Design a protein with these regions (language model features):
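C-terminal substrate-recognition "lid" of short-chain dehydrogenase/reductases
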Residues: 133, 144, 236-265, 270
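Substrate-binding pocket helix/loop in short-chain dehydrogenase/reductase
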Residues: 112-113, 120-125, 151, 217, ...
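Conserved glycine-rich cofactor-binding loop
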Residues: 26-27
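Residue(s) in the substrate-gating loop at a strand-loop-helix junction
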Residues: 156
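Conserved glycine-rich Rossmann-like NAD(P)H-binding loop of the short-chain dehydrogenase/reductase
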Residues: 40-57
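Active-site helix of classical SDR
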Residues: 136, 172, 180
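Short, small/polar-rich loop/turn modules that mediate ligand/substrate recognition or access, typified
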Residues: 188, 198, 203, 258-260
Length: 271
């Protein structure tokens, strides 16, 4: 941002008073989701696993562009059940509540099935699928007590189509579909039992991004990118902000009658 550019300000107050925890929230799609939430007044808890300096800088950047939105960063290993539960407790302790959980963090360890090691398989499943379960389990306990909350799973179009060398990744991302639908049914059942159906409810949905212009694609050769774009009916890569807008909608009150659904944000790749 240059000195001549206007500083972004709050775009509205639809999420004012809400607290959103976004895993993998300091870069790529996760960072775009955090900015979108902050623009509508939400307090942000951004999860990260590695670069503390970059995470703290992201926190400062959000604070400078959205001074009315409190932002914290939380380090943890999403593949660890203990760390997932600790992080949820930490967010609630620091912010006093948790209204929105976005399970966005993910890793890859691509190898063809005959070359994939046990560790390659387990680590990707642990982070991309099991971590989403542990985080959601801990968050739901808090949300169901209050009768309100939103959980959004960031899956992938690869969970629908499969991908060569991605048996672990595609299995984990496909697993998020079943997890989403099961948690949605259980949450709805619990809310009904508590007699809290008149509120905004507790909903769980998923989005499936396609090939998106993030840091992960910056080192991909142009020829490979051109081949990827040729597969996309809309003929271009997606933008992190385009995914963020759908996640934002599914996290807001306006989506209160939508639960257990999978939303494609992939330029038509899953048609």
């Amino acid at each position: 941002m240059t000195a001549t550019q206007p500083r972004p300000t709050r775009a509205g107050n639809k999420l004012e008073g809400r607290v959103a925890f976004v895993t993998g929230g300091t870069r790529g799609i996760g960072a775009a989701i955090c900015r979108s939430f902050a623009g509508q007044g939400a307090a942000i808890a951004a999860g990260y696993s590695g670069n503390q300096q970059a995470a703290e800088q992201f926190c400062k950047d959000i604070g400078s562009t959205h001074p009315d939105s409190r932002t914290t960063v939380h380090r943890g290993d999403i593949g660890s059940a203990e760390d997932c539960r600790r992080t949820i407790a930490e967010v609630i302790e620091q912010h006093g509540r948790l209204d929105i959980l976005v399970n966005n963090a993910g890793i890859t360890a691509d190898k063809t099935v005959l070359k994939m090691t046990d560790d390659d398989w387990r680590r990707v499943i642990d982070v991309n699928l099991s971590g989403a379960f542990y985080l959601s389990q801990a968050a739901l306990e808090h949300m169901l007590d209050r009768g309100t909350g939103r959980i959004v799973m960031v899956s992938s179009v690869i969970g629908e189509t499969g991908g060569i060398g991605q048996a672990n990744y595609s299995s984990a991302k496909a697993g998020l579909f079943g997890l989403t639908k099961t948690l949605a049914r259980e949450a709805a059942m619990q809310v009904q039992r508590k007699g809290l159906t008149d509120g905004i409810g507790v909903t769980i949905n998923a989005v499936t991004p396609g090939y998106t212009a993030t840091e992960m694609l910056e080192t991909v050769p142009d020829k490979v990118l051109d081949a990827l774009k040729a597969k996309i009916p809309l003929g271009r890569l997606g933008l992190p902000e385009e995914v963020a807008r759908v996640v934002h909608f599914l996290s807001a009150d306006a989506s209160g009658y939508i639960t257990g659904q999978v939303w494609g944000v992939n330029g038509g790749l899953d048609m």
